[in-house]
Each structure stands twice: as structure tokens, then as C-alpha cells.
Amino acid sequence: MIAEINHVTLIVDNLEAAATFYENEMGLEPVPAFVFDYPTAFFRITDTTQLHLSEWEDTRSFRGHLCVRVDNFSELFYRMKKQGRIDTAPWGKVRRLPDGAMQAFIRDPAGNLIELTSFPDDEIDPAIFDDELYEEGLYVSGRNDFRGYKAENATLYHPKK
């Protein structure tokens, strides 16, 4: 069912230091992030995989997660909902991102946080947009800290170079 890893998010305590390390020492290319209200930086790992850095003061990593693009977002959404695996606590409800990709967070049996995403143009069951677990717009943390490289046209998917 999983088609590929889309991105990995790491929680950091100093965005600037971490971003400098991944760009200068690891050779990753910075790419625009969505316009979140908290410090974040996105990097291209491959044409289809990104590293996301988010600055938080978490004592346990309940926001750090693995993101996978799935073949059929709607089918998996309903299956995970039935199993009670959808977790809206760390990053909010199921959403359509500005680029059109869908986003949901689930917990695996061990409690690891996994983000499910679709391609921006994938067909999505319209009933999901009326579900109590769906919410319009980007997640808002209330921090109003907009540090990091961000753009209105950010996407999880980049064309091959």
C-alpha cells in the first residue's frame, strides 16, 4: 500500500543551527516550506523525498514523524478511522494542503506517528471533506513564529531535475 517515503520530520531546538548543518554539512538543498506559524525548514533529499525540520521544545517527540505517500488515501483514511488510529492531537485534523495533497496522521501499534499523504491531483472521496475528522486550512500552532524559508506555492512534490 505504501508507495514511497515523502518526507521525514525532525524536531530541533535551534532551527538556524540545524538548517545550517543540513545545508552546509550534509549538502541538502533548501526548498520552500508551507507558511506555518512556527519555525520550520524543508530540504530536498531526492526528487521525491524531503527532510523537514521543526523547532519545538518537546520533551518527547510526539510531533516527529515519518510521512508516506499512499496509493489510495480515501480507502486508507476510512480503514484507519475504523481502527481508531487517526491522531489529531499533534498536528491537527485531516487536511488538504495548499498544493492539493491530502494529509492525515495515524499511530502505528507501537505509538509511532505516521503521516499519510496523497499526490495533489489524486481523486479523494468527497465525503472526507464533510467528516468530523476533516478541517480546512493549514495547522495553526498559535505560536506566530514565522522563521524559516516559506512560500505560498510550497509543495510536498517537486518535479525531477
Model region roles, listed by residue range:
Residues 52-54, 105, 115:
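Conserved beta-strand in the GNAT
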Residues 5-7, 61-66:
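Eukaryotic phosphotyrosine signaling hubs
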Residues 47-50, 59-61, 71-76:
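Short, charged/polar surface micro-motifs in flexible loops or helix N-caps
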Residues 2, 9-50:
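Core segments of cupin and vicinal oxygen chelate
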Residues 15, 66-113, 121-124, 139-161:
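Vicinal oxygen chelate
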Residues 35-40, 60-62, 97-102:
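Short acidic/glycine-enriched loop/turn segments that link adjacent beta-strands
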Residues 128-137:
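Short, compositionally biased
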